[in-house]
Structures are given as structure tokens and as C-alpha cells.
Amino acid sequence: SDITGVNGEAEFVRPIYAGNAIATVTSSDAVKVITVRTSAFDAAPTGAGTGAITAVDNAVDCGLSRVVSEEIAQSERPELASASIVVSGGRGVGSEENFALIEKLADRLNAALGASRAAVDAGFIGNDHQVGQTGKIVAPDLYVAVGISGAIQHLAGMQGSKVIVAINK
């Protein structure tokens, strides 16, 4: 799971020990089921291939639930997983009010907004902004980390960044 490279038809490369080591694994099974780390490979060119499209019937409505409302979440910021610049804050920011400064910096740089798990757990920001082993994996051109301790779980989510700027006290 979470492969970062393909060496052959049955040989794959994947991180282990929270990204501290790389393992080469092989599979002799005829059918292989793998997951791919989102930032590990370049995107395929648009229109590079075709795939079969199969229409399926709608599920039967059992009447046990109902839609109260539908709203599309909108943001001026780029999507976290595909942004070229990410500004992330950690517990070192100190408070939800101080985290608003991180949001302003992200807006000025037209960057996506990220956070460490500690900042999410402290209630500074929602978990949809979490970067790391239990959050999103990012690989921007520029990653700005403000008040982030550098826990290995967070590093696992942003180690593919081209340039990393860390700001701490």
C-alpha cells in the first residue's frame, strides 16, 4: 500500500516506518491490489487513454433517510493536495485567533491552508486541513510551516515538498 515507485510488473517501492525507510516489495499473486501515494507520480497527460464506462442503475430508496439541504463548499484557496504553495500552522501558533494570521498569509500567497494534527486537535482549524500521516499528503513547490514541531507523522505528509520554510520562535 502507499507505493511511491514501480520497478517492474511485480516489484514496488513503498515507505515504511512512517517514511523513515524505503522498502522494495514483490508480489507473486496474479491479481495485485495496490494503493498509490497521491504525490508520488506525475499526472497522466489529458486524453492519454480511454476506459470503459459502465452504466449502473440507481440504488433503491428505502425511505429511511432524507436530504435536508445540499450546499457546495466554496473557497478562494487552492485545493490542499494539489496546491503549488501550502502554508501550514501548528500548535506553536498558540490559539485560534493567532491561526487567523496563518490564514491571512495563505491568502496573500494564494496558497492552500494546512495544519499539523496538534493544531487540529487543539481546535485551531478543521481536520480537512490536516497534513501528515493521518491527514493529506502534499508535495508543493513551497511549503511554509509556522509553529510546527516537525513530528515524523507530519513530515510523512509533506516530505515531497520542493522547498520547505520553517518559522518558529
Model-identified regions with their sequence ranges:
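N-terminal glycine-rich FAD/FM-binding segment characteristic of electron-transfer flavoproteins
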Residues: 1-169
